[in-house]
Amino acid sequence: MLNYQQPDASGHFGRYGGSFVAETLIHALDELKAAYARYRDDPEFVAEFKSELAHFVGRPSPIYHAARMSRELGGAQIYLKREDLNHTGAHKINNTIGQALLARRMGKPRVIAETGAGQHGVATATICARYGMECVVYMGSEDVKRQSPNVYRMHLLGARVVPVDSGSKTLKDALNEALRDWVTNVENTFYIIGTVAGPAPYPEMVRDFQSVIGEECLRQMPEMAGRQPDAVIACVGGGSNAMGIFYPYIRHEGVRLIGVEAAGHGLDSGKHAASLSAGSPGVLHGNRTYLLQDANGQIIETHSISAGLDYPGVGPEHAYLKDIGRAEYVGITDDEALQAFHRLCRTEGIIPALESSHAVAYAMKLAPTMRSDQSLLVNLSGRGDKDIGTVADLSGAEFYDRPSSRGEKVKQ
């Protein structure tokens, strides 16, 4: 892996990736490719990006030794990369800053985005408020219900949130509507895609902006643990937090890369969102990758306790890493993620996002099978404030209420 150089000039990761879009968008994508090629190594652009990460986001995010959890589980030591401590509460802000800086240089005053868990929407709304840009966020109506705190955050930040009622009313459908908007308003609009999917150059560009996560880990782990981890673990929906931490480690062949998908009610139940574990190659949202589809190539509905993992595809670089055997992908069920959520709360005083809880859950499974002198690095991609209502409801917490807009109490 020392010579890993992906994607190629046409945006392909092996047989995955590429650009499968309406003719209307070809010019916009060519324009974006040219702008990214021009600015990615531009000293002024790089300096501004790094300054925003340091002074607006609060990077570098720390690595934390989950010592009590590690002792209770036995085996490997578990370390957490604390992306939950970033401004806005997740890794998403790393990417939105990079793309917003590009949008400004390209003269695009209007920004659109899709969101599932709401974190990418909040991050996009945040940076648009900072830069004085118009912001429209598309969100599946089911996700609007289960992520209402983030919906209100977006409103507070000045964004217009558009609920999407088509299809499964989740992330896939929000992305469809965002693409339709972009086709209609391509001249003045920049589409900030939140994950490492979509047509080229998005998978590469989002990966590059997120790779600050892994680059920091390469410096921090020797200080924290004396050496690099034996395995890096991250949840995978579209896969941006995972690629952000995986990419700098790809060349370190002694480090396992483990992506954790949403197994929902179980991989055999048909109610999950594990496209790498149970899908097949196809084309969706402008790129070729692993998809959950039927025999006729129709996308099937997905399920996950976590809105951010509830997507029938995955970034094409993950598909490539799976095929070449550099990364491995496993599934964690809703119940396992919920147990991990509670355990991290009780043992370490950290409330994780349900997305991140999938990665924590797999670390809890893997650690006891390893030696105490080995280590696992988990990307804690976001905080769980947004999921409190969902967790309380699923846990049967009768006492949990939230105030309505009229000051009344509304049972969740």
UniProtKB/Swiss-Prot annotation:
Cofactor(s) of this protein: pyridoxal 5'-phosphate
Keywords: Amino-acid biosynthesis, Aromatic amino acid biosynthesis, Lyase, Pyridoxal phosphate, Tryptophan biosynthesis
Pathway(s) served: Amino-acid biosynthesis; L-tryptophan biosynthesis; L-tryptophan from chorismate: step 5/5
CDD domains according to UniProt: Trp-synth_B
Protein's UniProt keywords contain Amino-acid biosynthesis: yes
A single MF term (Gene Ontology): tryptophan synthase activity
Catalytic activity: (1S,2R)-1-C-(indol-3-yl)glycerol 3-phosphate + L-serine = D-glyceraldehyde 3-phosphate + L-tryptophan + H2O
Gene Ontology cellular component list: cytoplasm
EC number: 4.2.1.20
Modified sites of kind N6-(pyridoxal phosphate)lysine: 92
NCBIfam families per UniProt: trpB (TIGR00263)
Function according to Swiss-Prot or TrEMBL: The beta subunit is responsible for the synthesis of L-tryptophan from indole and L-serine.
Protein family (similarity comment): Belongs to the TrpB family.
Subunit structure: Tetramer of two alpha and two beta chains.
Protein name as catalogued: Tryptophan synthase beta chain
